[in-house]
Structures are given as structure tokens and as C-alpha cells.
């Protein structure tokens, strides 16, 4: 009799625990944690709540800007981001830009791997990536980045340190691009914060920086994930500040023309989890 009582209590406790776990997992799956990329410039591998495949449509408008901060004119991009297993994530993008009387295209493929964390929907994770880009200027660029993120139901933090090697004349031997983003829950599934990107920051101490000098983009960000929806929305806008100007003329290079004036860019992303 006592054995049956203990067995019954054990079964009831087990069922209660499983139901509670399912409720928590379902809540996280349908939360802001399930989106593929809350930020516009700062990318990371997928957390367990977002380990699916998503289609991302992004676009923007910019003036006096360069890749990867934006595009001079109007650009539109279609991307796919998906989970490959064992904490590997793949990101692909194709884009088209209209500006300066020309039509230009852009392609990207990148694979991410989380080495620390990445086993729980919330908390800290850290990893790296390797990829290749064909820029709007037709330059071929190989990139690798260290990426870190921290997420919970109220906060989102992300940071990238991205190293690029462009195979084109008139470009730096290597470029370092740093970015970070912070989002705080405002109400429900609506988040607000800021995202910043620094490019060619070696121009702060090198007067002969090959690509015109240091550039910084910083601006407010919004992110929204409707409850029990496969959609997510992100928006960022801000000025592009040319903090320093190199003694090398930007127009010495026939490959691409670099702006001399401060600029601005507006960028959005609409994500859809299709698998």
C-alpha cells in the first residue's frame, strides 16, 4: 500500500514537472527570444528558442554612406537564417541597391558557431563566424567575427568584433568593424534601445588610413515580436559620422568613392519563421 502511494505521488510530481517545463518552453518559444535577429547590424548565432529557419526581408535608405553601414540610395535584401545543429547557424543574404543612377547587387554567406553558452534560450553565449561577401562595389570580402549576446525576456545585449579582408586595390589590408546593440522591453513584446557601429577605427590613430578615416553610426532601435506570431520587426536610424579624414584622398581609389560629408541611414527588417 505504501509502495503504491509513493509511486502515485512520484507519477503526479513527474507529470506536474513536465507540464510546467512545457509551459515554460512554449512561453519562451512564442516570446521575443524566438526571433532570428533582433538587431540590424550586430549578428549572432541562434539561441535554442529560435532554432528554426527564417526568411528576412530588409531594406533601407542612406546618404553619404558605405558598406556595411548602409547604401547610398535605396536597397532591398532577402536573407535566410537557419539552425544547422550542434550550435551552428547559417546566414545568407542577397541584395539590390538603386542609387547614383546605377543598380548594384550584394551577396553574403556566413556560418556561426557558439562555443560558450547557446544551450539555453536565455543567458550569455559567445562564438565566432566565417563568411564571404560580394559588396555593392563588386569587391570580394572574406570576414570573420567574434560575437557575444545576452538575452532574457526583458533585455537584449549583443556585440560583434568583425575582421574583414577585401580583395581589391585601394582597400585596407584588413578592416576591423565593431558593433553593439542594447534593447530593453518597453511594453509587452515591444523593445527599444540603441545600436552603434564603428568602421575603420584605426583611422583614429593612422593619418594615412586607406579608406578615408574612421566612421561611426549610432542611432535608436525598435524591435517588436507579436505574441504567438511568426513575424518580427526591427528598425534603426541614425547619423553616420566621419570622425576623422585620412590624408589619402578617398578618390585615389578607382574601386569605390567614399563620402567626404557626414551622412545618415534608415534600415528595417521583417523576419518570418517558416520552418
Question: Positions of the model-derived regions?
Answer:
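General helical structural elements
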Residues: 7-8, 117
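Bacterial N-terminal signal peptides that target proteins for export
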Residues: 1-7
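Bacterial N-terminal signal peptides
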Residues: 8-16
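Anionic-ligand binding region
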Residues: 178
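Transmembrane beta-barrel domains of Gram-negative outer membranes and organellar outer membranes
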Residues: 22-144, 149-168, 175, 183, ...
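Sec/Tat signal peptide C-region and signal peptidase I cleavage site
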Residues: 17-21
Amino acid at each position: 500500500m505504501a509502495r503504491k502511494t509513493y509511486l502515485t505521488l512520484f507519477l503526479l510530481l513527474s507529470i506536474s514537472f513536465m507540464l510546467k517545463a512545457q509551459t515554460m518552453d512554449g512561453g519562451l518559444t512564442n516570446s521575443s527570444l524566438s526571433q532570428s535577429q533582433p538587431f540590424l547590424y550586430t549578428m549572432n548565432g541562434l539561441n535554442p528558442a529560435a532554432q528554426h529557419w527564417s526568411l528576412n526581408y530588409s531594406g533601407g535608405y542612406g546618404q553619404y554612406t558605405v558598406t556595411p553601414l548602409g547604401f547610398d540610395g535605396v536597397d532591398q535584401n532577402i536573407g535566410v537564417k537557419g539552425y544547422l545543429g550542434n550550435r551552428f547557424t547559417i546566414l545568407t543574404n542577397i541584395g539590390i541597391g538603386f542609387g547614383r543612377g546605377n543598380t548594384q547587387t550584394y551577396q553574403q554567406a556566413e556560418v556561426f558557431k557558439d562555443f560558450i553558452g547557446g544551450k539555453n534560450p536565455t543567458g550569455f553565449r559567445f562564438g565566432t563566424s566565417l563568411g564571404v561577401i560580394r559588396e555593392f562595389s563588386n569587391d570580394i570580402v572574406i570576414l570573420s567575427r567574434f560575437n557575444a549576446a545576452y538575452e532574457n525576456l526583458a533585455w537584449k545585449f549583443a556585440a560583434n568584433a568583425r575582421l574583414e579582408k577585401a580583395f581589391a586595390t585601394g582597400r585596407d589590408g584588413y578592416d576591423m568593424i565593431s558593433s553593439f546593440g542594447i534593447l530593453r522591453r518597453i511594453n509587452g513584446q515591444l523593445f527599444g534601445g540603441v545600436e552603434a557601429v564603428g568602421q575603420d577605427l584605426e583611422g583614429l590613430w593612422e593619418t594615412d588610413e586607406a579608406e578615408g578615416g574612421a566612421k561611426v553610426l549610432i542611432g535608436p532601435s525598435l524591435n517588436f515580436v507579436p505574441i504567438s506570431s511568426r513575424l518580427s520587426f526591427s528598425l534603426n536610424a541614425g547619423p553616420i559620422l566621419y570622425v576623422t579624414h585620412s590624408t589619402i584622398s578617398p578618390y585615389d581609389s578607382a574601386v569605390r568613392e567614399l563620402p567626404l560629408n557626414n551622412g545618415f541611414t534608415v534600415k528595417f527588417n521583417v523576419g518570418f519563421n517558416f520552418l
